[in-house]
Amino acid sequence: MKGIILLISCLMLIEVVVGGKEGYPLDSSGCKAGCFFGTNSWCNTECKRKSAAKGYCAWPSCYCYEFTDDSKIWNAKTNKCYK
């Protein structure tokens, strides 16, 4: 039983390490990049431009997957949007 729990824990850790960062890309104001009138393909392009692998429109903001480690993404704790 302990072995199964250890295996599952290792697999979850591998997913976190391999999966990369994900979140909302920043616009020039430090806010989430909006997709109020955008589409999934527009957000996917924006995400790739911001060094992510892919993304989609999670209305009203773009959401990206697999950012590089040095990418800046929106964080609720350090939000400086229009401040």
Swiss-Prot record:
One of its GO terms (molecular function) is sodium channel inhibitor activity. Residues 1-19 form the signal peptide. Expressed by the venom gland. Its main location: secreted. Keywords: Disulfide bond, Ion channel impairing toxin, Neurotoxin, Secreted, Signal, Toxin, Voltage-gated sodium channel impairing toxin. CDD domains: neurotoxins_LC_scorpion (cd23106). Disulfide bonds join C31-C81, C35-C57, C43-C62, C47-C64. GO terms for cellular component: extracellular region. Residues 21-82 form the LCN-type CS-alpha/beta domain. Belongs to the long (4 C-C) scorpion toxin superfamily. Sodium channel inhibitor family. Beta subfamily. Beta toxins bind voltage-independently at site-4 of sodium channels (Nav) and shift the voltage of activation toward more negative potentials thereby affecting sodium channel activation and promoting spontaneous and repetitive firing. Has the structural arrangement of an alpha-helix connected to antiparallel beta-sheets by disulfide bonds (CS-alpha/beta). This is Toxin To15. It comes from Tityus obscurus (Amazonian scorpion).
